Amino acid sequence: MAGISEVPVATADRLRGEGHRILDVREDDEFAAGHIAGAVHVPLMQIPARAAELDRDADWLAVCRVGGRSLQATAYLSRLGLRVANVEGGMEAWSGAGLPFEGAAGGPGRVI
């Protein structure tokens, strides 16, 4: 989508270390199977109803499984004035790059 900020996973990991927040827009079962530690979980279909819960002063990185749903969330939230970038390739790329993520109760995660 034109005008939407996207970042590769290595950049997203660096930005996360610098204080950017992670917004995971996958479904509950996907999030439970594996997610980036500290991620805020709001499934894509709940974004319109729950956007007000997101810190408007934060810089956000949106993620899903491969990047499509998070791109939609990024476009919507950007129109609302939030500072948000899409993580290219989503959790598949994150996992493929060997970046850390966890499953339920802090155990090993997997991408479904």
Residue ranges and their predicted role:
Residues 63:
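Short, surface-exposed ligand- or partner-binding patches at beta-edge/loop junctions that are enriched
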Residues 1-21, 27-60, 68-112:
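Rhodanese-like catalytic fold shared by cysteine-dependent sulfurtransferases
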